[in-house]
Amino acid sequence: MTGKTRIWFNRGFSLAPIAGLMRAADHTLDVFVSVSHQSAHYNGPTETWIDGGDLEPDDKDGYLQWVREMIAVHEIDIFIPTRRRALVASASLPCRVHLPASIPTLEILDDKFLFAAEFAGEEHHLPTHLAQGSDDLERLLDGWPTSEGEPGPCVKPRNGVNGLGFWRLMDVSPLAHLQDSERRRIRPEQYLSAVRGQELRGPIDDIVVMPYLPGPEISFDILATHVKMLKYAARTKLGTGRQHIVSRHPLEDLVASIVAKFSLHGVVNAHFRRAEDGRCMLLEINARPAGGVVYADQV
């Protein structure tokens, strides 16, 4: 035994630098992070390893056995899962398991359509529509407002993280999505054609469609204990690539109410973006630390 408290986060690439901050702040901690096969491994002081080892992705029993082995080998005291949470919560493990919310709540937070529905009728609610296939998507796009000043549509996977699968549907060059893919712009008929093509190969994941928000983004890094927000930092992402970070923000009361609504616990992140009319619309709650929390710590 090392005499230190040993904490393990699973499958969180951005958590490795966060873990380094934790160790620097408290020398009684050892922090480990398991990452995906595609992620880079960090050289100490935080140890990283492949999450799940060589197991097949759908081997649930094998994954739990691997987790038990890692807990034993590394003498883990606290396991903080950021993936496969329902599976982990259902198992009996030889250490403490920390979750940022109940499993039913996490299922809502991970579902962009259900999450948006939780705030229907409220000022910061972002209207979010569900497309379960190309026919749904075509109907939504055909009925989308086209008058001047109306925001165009954007699409995302119903369940997804890190902005994967986000596209703005716009009247752009047919090559725009190939020549400048980082701007995430594609013609609506090209996106719809791609969805139809994918359907010929098999079932597709649900898509959500919502108005595009010009921004800027405002990201709240939150420390909470169940229903109470203890501390936060708000990061406004500027167009220059820099961030403006404050510890007091006009949205503070709203964010505190969201923490209470979902009984959030630990370090989580609330993500807003400004609409054309200046309102801050709630995009999502990430029930895990955001990578940008390291910037807030520096100030």
Spans of model-derived segments:
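Glycine-rich phosphate/pyrophosphate-binding beta-alpha loops
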Residues: 163, 236-243, 286-298
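ATP-binding N-terminal substructure of ATP-dependent carboxylate-amine bond-forming enzymes
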Residues: 1-101
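Phosphate-binding site of ATP-dependent enzymes
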Residues: 179-258, 262-263, 273-281
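Catalytic phosphate/metal-binding cores of nucleic-acid and nucleotide-processing enzymes, i.e., regions
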Residues: 270
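Active-site nucleotide/adenylate-binding loops and adjacent lid/helix of ATP-dependent enzymes
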Residues: 106-206
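Short, charged, surface-exposed secondary-structure boundary motifs
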Residues: 41-44, 59-62, 107-114, 163-165, ...
